[in-house]
Design a protein with these regions (language model features):
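Non-catalytic helical/linker scaffolds that mediate oligomerization, partner binding
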Residues: 1-276
Length: 276
């Protein structure tokens, strides 16, 4: 499939759904050729010894995290909400633990497709995710020990600098990642930053894919030739205050590539910006 897409210059993304034991035997290759991974625990649980399923889930998450690709945990997350307005305690813990393990996204299926309480299911999952992300149990501003080093060290150096800066800048309200491909945004996401990442991108398809990554909200912009100058910073200040609720005196971290911040070149720039 990857060869066919490449041959036709397609930018479609491949999210591989892991549901067979045979996939586990080739999981490293599958992750390499995929843009993201879904742990489909329903079918996987049928063909895998039930006591092994939590180990399999954690292993897939760690391997996918290590190469900075999004990983989705799905199936029977809040299964009881197909019939009931509240989940079981075990289900709430299951969702939380998937996020602690490193899942970028958790996914509902039958709860919203055929359940009696679809809106409530989404609302409760959102609350669980937000609370666990803000808890002391989450890794914050730290990269996992398993993360692979980069052949292109500059974007990784920027991402590490962002993580280190956030540790020492308690007033920071967000990371503004100006990107053409989302590459550095994905790197920064893997450190599980203590603040939201706002991924500014001209390409709507890239922006939608970035939404899968932990802590990332994508914002579409119309001009990829943005430069760091006085007028651009004034516009950014107004946007951050009006659209994102930030205030004068708040700080954000800006990343991009100079001279044009979203030119498609590797990220080579980081700036601490105080909103005025």
């Amino acid at each position: 499939m990857r060869a066919i897409l490449d041959k036709n210059n397609s930018r479609l993304r491949i999210i591989s759904k892991i549901e067979k034991p045979q996939a586990l035997e080739n999981i490293d290759d599958i992750i390499e050729y995929s843009d993201g991974i879904m742990v489909a625990r329903g079918d996987l649980g049928i063909e895998t010894p039930i006591q092994q399923l939590p180990i399999v889930q954690k292993t897939i998450i760690r391997k996918t995290n290590a190469v900075r690709k999004p990983v989705i945990v799905a199936t029977q997350m809040l299964e009881s909400m197909i019939e009931n307005p509240m989940p079981t305690r075990a289900e709430a813990s299951d969702v939380a633990n998937a996020i602690i393990d490193g899942a970028d996204a958790v996914m509902l299926s039958g709860e919203t497709a055929a359940g009696k309480y679809p809106v409530e299911a989404v609302s409760i999952m959102k609350k669980i995710a937000e609370d666990i992300n803000n808890s002391q149990f989450m890794r914050k501003n730290e990269f996992p020990s398993t993360i692979r080093t980069e052949e292109n060290a500059i974007p990784m150096s920027i991402a590490v600098s962002v993580a280190d800066t956030l540790k020492n800048l308690p007033k920071a309200k967000g990371v503004i990642a100006l990107t053409a491909t989302g590459y550095t945004t994905a790197l920064i996401s893997e450190c599980r930053p203590s603040v939201p990442i706002y991924s500014f991108c001209e390409d709507a398809k890239v922006g939608r894919f970035m939404q899968l990554f932990n802590s990332v909200s994508s914002i579409k912009v119309d001009d990829k030739n943005i430069e760091i100058d006085k007028s651009s910073l004034i516009e950014l200040n107004e946007f951050l205050k009006k659209e994102l609720g930030m205030e004068t005196g708040d700080c954000v971290i800006i990343t991009g590539s100079v001279p044009h911040l979203m030119s498609g070149q590797s990220t080579n720039f980081m700036k601490i910006h105080k909103i005025s």
